[in-house]
């Protein structure tokens, strides 16, 4: 029996799917050429030739493992790699894999960029005050304030006749052991602090003067109707040298956006 023969037109038409020729591809050097046929929006048959450059890359084991996954659905018979008929390639994202040494260098660079955020109140260094190496030393603001207080107190005791300084009667030459006659209270260690803000409270006043020395009493002048601070206060220190230190340190000191004025309290009649 003779084999059944068909015409070449029938064989070509039988190979076409939906009236389109099959896709073809070939590799030439480092390039891969893929030829496809499809219908455009107008229903016309068009030929699409895509050119791929073949490159060899070193990828991580996870990426190589993903490329070997078995495809499913309409792409179960596709070869490794994307298929334009079932896969739409978006913008390529490049991933940079760094070793531990490179990560540490990058991390240190980022830390150096933001190191000026912290500023020490003690030595003005580029670190937090709690981590200052000079904390508790002579450069500490608290220690410096105590040193100024001691120096001012010593100057007040050693040089009571210096002009421009208030000297209580018991420290003047020829004075008796007792204070001035007719005085019921001793204001020799009292200071007047003025130019205070309206929001000043007794707690704020105590925080302001407690680092200088112990005090016996305080008085913060307030408005009767509003209860706001009138702008001045009196502080009676236990020791006169502490009062002198308060004037030396706090007079001209900026507090709550205002410049304080601290002076000896005038004797009250």
UniProtKB/Swiss-Prot annotation:
Major location (coarse): cytoplasm
* Subunit structure, interactors included: Component of the eukaryotic translation initiation factor 3 (eIF-3) complex. The eIF-3 complex interacts with pix.
Q: Which organism is it from?
A: Drosophila ananassae (Fruit fly)
PANTHER family assigned to the protein according to its UniProt record, in alphabetical order: EUKARYOTIC TRANSLATION INITIATION FACTOR 3 SUBUNIT G
Give GO cellular component annotations, separated by semicolons: eukaryotic 43S preinitiation complex; eukaryotic 48S preinitiation complex; eukaryotic translation initiation factor 3 complex
Domain of life here?
Eukaryota
**Primary gene name:** eIF3g2
Keyword annotations from UniProtKB, A to Z? Cytoplasm, Initiation factor, Protein biosynthesis, RNA-binding
**What range does the record give for the signal peptide?**
none
An annotated Gene Ontology molecular function = RNA binding
> Has keyword RNA-binding?
yes
Cellular compartment(s): Cytoplasm
Family recorded in the similarity comment: Belongs to the eIF-3 subunit G family.
From the Swiss-Prot or TrEMBL record, give the protein name: Eukaryotic translation initiation factor 3 subunit G-2
Alphabetically, which GO biological process terms does the record hold? Answer: formation of cytoplasmic translation initiation complex
User: What function does this protein fulfil?
Assistant: RNA-binding component of the eukaryotic translation initiation factor 3 (eIF-3) complex, which is involved in protein synthesis of a specialized repertoire of mRNAs and, together with other initiation factors, stimulates binding of mRNA and methionyl-tRNAi to the 40S ribosome. The eIF-3 complex specifically targets and initiates translation of a subset of mRNAs involved in cell proliferation. This subunit can bind 18S rRNA.
Keyword Cytoplasm on entry? yes
Q: Which InterPro entries match?
A: eIF3_g (IPR017334), eIF3g_N (IPR024675), eIF3G_RRM (IPR034240), Nucleotide-bd_a/b_plait_sf (IPR012677), RBD_domain_sf (IPR035979), RRM_dom (IPR000504)
The residues covered by the RRM domain are 189-267
